[in-house]
Amino acid sequence: VVAGIYHEWDKQFRKWVYDEISHWYRGEIVLAKIWTVDVGKLVELFSALGWEIRNKSYFQKLNTCRLVVNVFKHGDGTSLAELQQHYPEYLYNPFDSFGGQLSDVTHLDHTNLRVSDEHINEFSEAMIEFWLDLPERIVNSPSASLPKWFESAILIDQKNENNNK
C-alpha cells in the first residue's frame, strides 16, 4: 500500500515539476532529467528557486515514506541505514526488551520493516499537506544558484541546440 501511494505521489509530483519548468524552459535533456533524478535532487532545485520544502512540516514524513519504500523495494542499503539511524520505529526489533547489544537496531535488516495503519495515515496526510502547500508557480530567477545536475543538463541542451543549427 505504502509503495503504491508513494509511487503515485512521485509520478504526480514529477509531472507537476515538468509542467512548471516547461513554462520557462524547453530543453529536452532538462525535461527528461525530471523523470530520472532522485527526488532529493528535485528538492535541491526547488530550494535554489526559493521553495524551501525541507523546512516544511510534512517533509520529514515524505522523506521517511521514501526510505520505507526503498527498503521494501531494494532491501538492505543506504535507505535501511537511514531508517536505523533516524526512524527506528519503522523496524520491528524482537529483542528490544532484552536491552544491550541485542536491542541495537543496526542488527536489523529489511525483513524487520514494519508499517502500521497509523504510519500509512501519517504518510497520506503529509502528501495532502504537500499538495496544499505547493506554490502556484515555480519560476526561474536569474540570481538562483541552480544545482549542478540542472546546470549540466542545460549545457547539454545548449550544445545540442548549437549542433542543430
Regions found by a protein language model. Give the residues of each.
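A hydrophobic membrane-anchoring alpha-helix module
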Residues: 109-150
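Short, highly charged C-terminal tails/helix-capping segments
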Residues: 30-32, 143-160
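Short catalytic/metal-binding and nucleic-acid-binding patches
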Residues: 164-165
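A generic signature of intrinsically disordered, low-complexity regions enriched in glycine/proline
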Residues: 14, 42, 123, 133, ...
